[in-house]
Amino acid sequence: MKKWMTFLCILLLCSSQTLLSVSAAPAKSVSSTPRQTQITVRTATNFKTESDVKKFVQLASKYKISVIYLNVKQDEDDEVPSGYVYYKSKVAPIAKGYRNFDILKSMIKEAHKKSIKVYAWVPQFHDRAALKKYPNAQMKTLVGKKTVAYNQNGEYFVNPLNKKIQKYEISILKEISKKYDVDG
């Protein structure tokens, strides 16, 4: 027992010296990277018209917001079925009320005028539209049974390991990145 105590004391002293030598190093200078102020915004509850976008961007600029995370694909079922998009898509179904109003195009145009970046928020696997397209791609339990809905709307998650789902979700990301001048 005495040998172990001696060993532990020596180990503690060695590690203390190592810590002291590391902490004795001169401090690095603070990065000159400008701070970003970000906001995440849901489309269905905030934007129905071009005017809504303009007002929002004016406020964002006033409060020095530098990045807007814009929900471009629905992930809940309270306003719009999940998986429906808010931009002109050839891949995913377009949400009701957005066939003639491309929120992503509008937000990018207005935000970039004020030097505000726009990041496309694209939820992936809570996707009723994908489940309609690929009914066998529903998430399953470890024993192979379909998962039960987590709410009264009957909403399910699609399986992220399913190759068809992966291809579908990636095609949405590619479409956005090719078609729009998003910043992230």
What are these regions (language model features)?
Residues 15-29:
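Sec-dependent signal peptide cleavage junction
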Residues 25-39, 51, 59:
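N-terminal carbohydrate-binding accessory modules
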Residues 31-38, 44-46, 125-180:
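Active-site-adjacent "subsite" loops/lids of carbohydrate-active enzymes
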Residues 45-63, 90-114:
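Aromatic- and glycine-enriched glycan-recognition loops and surfaces
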Residues 72-96:
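Glycine-rich, proline-tolerant flexible connector loops at the mouths of alpha/beta enzymes
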